[in-house]
Design a protein with these regions (language model features):
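Glycine/GP-enriched mid-protein hinge/lid loop-to-helix segment characteristic of carbohydrate kinases
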Residues: 109-111, 119-121, 164-168, 172-285
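Short glycine-aspartate micro-motif
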Residues: 75, 85-89, 143-147, 208-213, ...
């Protein structure tokens, strides 16, 4: 079992802390690791020895430095030990599958059509397993872990609850674990957005970061020194225009709810981008899209008041496919007197690739010495 810590928690073991720092610093010495971690010299020596034995770091003997009569200082760097880390980002209609090496470089990737809500759980998982098998074919490397991100929420038992996928308590991890005989982690896509940032942050980085994701599903997550936490449930919302009265946010500001609100007014749009185009010449459509932006700002304001983040990250088609939404959101949020900095992830592709990499690397960065090449990576 993968431990310690939950998915996207900061590195806790000496080996994990050392690997994190070696990844962030192209060349670093053991003495510098002692200083950066606050751990003792013997602890660092044991941790780096274990990482060297696992092939996760290597010594740069060509950069050996000698100072006085002491022992020579040999710097360390990340090594490529021929492992494969698979990352799977499940979307409403498409799934992104990518393979990474231990340095976080993309080896292969693919997007496959997976209209999840129209597929049985078994058929969908078969599609995913086939996709991973296709990508790993012909690579002289060994799969050591699989990470999965999905819409909705993932409970403490790893079960997925996602209305837009039609999933209620789906245990995707068990099937993948059996198929590939490697550790599998499952996370909501929303914490994974922050996970991708914490994995490249300094160990001593302070300041909370909040992410608000609005797309086919809606959610938020918060990163603190203790790790990344999905914020469930979201603050409730009310809107006369949308006939919402102290209603749950998760479904009522998702894209389908917006399209349904347009359809109720005889405005037909199959995507948010199409709705935004219609709204250029249709005041009713524009009003509904604007209301969504204001409601999202209201949700964010409540979360900022409660958690006091330094930065709010915006992600999802609500802020991308509607060209007016991000500006309206920012203006509305400022009316709530928040000083939090706003940052937008500008493309869906960037989000998908980032979360696939983050969830793929999570086991390696959290428990690097627990991953071992399987003698039977794939079951027939």
């Amino acid at each position: 079992m993968i431990k310690p810590g939950s998915v996207f928690s900061p590195p806790q073991t000496p080996a994990a802390r050392c690997l994190h720092l070696v990844r962030l610093n192209p060349i670093i010495t053991r003495s510098e690791l002692v200083e950066a971690t606050g751990l003792s010299q013997p602890t660092i020596t044991r941790a780096t020895a274990a990482l060297l034995e696992a092939g996760l770091v290597q010594e740069r003997t060509d950069l050996t430095r000698t100072r006085g009569r002491g022992r020579p200082t040999v710097p360390l760097e990340v090594a490529d030990n021929k492992w494969i880390l698979a990352g799977i980002a499940i979307g409403t209609s498409r799934t992104h599958i990518a393979l990474f090496d231990t340095m976080g470089r993309t080896l292969r990737e693919d997007d496959i059509s997976t209209p999840v809500a129209r597929l049985s759980e078994s058929d969908f998982i078969e599609h995913i397993m086939a996709g991973v098998n296709r990508l790993t074919t012909g690579i002289s490397r060994t799969l050591v872990s699989v990470g999965v991100t999905t819409s909705g929420n993932v409970d403490e038992d790893g079960l997925v609850w996602a209305a837009n996928l039609g999933w209620e308590g789906v245990d995707i991890a068990a099937r993948l674990r059996y198929q590939f005989n490697v550790p599998v982690v499952v996370s909501s896509a929303i914490p994974a957005i922050l996970g991708s940032e914490t994995q490249s942050a300094d160990l001593n980085q302070t300041g909370k970061v909040l992410v608000l994701f609005a797309d086919d599903s809606t959610g938020a997550a918060l990163s603190t020194e203790a790790g990344v936490t999905q914020l469930v449930p979201l603050p409730r919302i009310s809107s006369e225009l949308l006939n919402l009265h102290d209603s749950a946010s998760e479904d009522n500001v998702a894209t389908q709810a917006v399209l349904d609100a347009l359809a109720a007014r005889e405005i037909s749009a199959s995507t948010l981008a199409e709705a935004a185009t219609i709204a250029e010449d249709n005041e009713t459509a524009r009003g509904i899209l604007d209301e969504r932006a204001h409601l999202l700002a209201s949700i964010a304001a409540d979360l900022v008041t409660e958690h006091n983040p330094v930065t709010v990250v915006l992600a999802g088609s609500a802020f991308i496919d509607d060209p007016h939404a991000a500006k309206l959101f920012a203006s509305s949020l400022r009316q709530h007197n928040t000083d939090a900095q706003l940052r937008l992830i500008p493309t869906h592709r960037e989000i998908v690739r980032a979360i696939a990499r983050a969830v793929a690397l999570d086991p390696l960065l959290r428990v690097p010495l627990s991953l071992q090449p399987s003698t039977a990576s794939v079951r027939s």
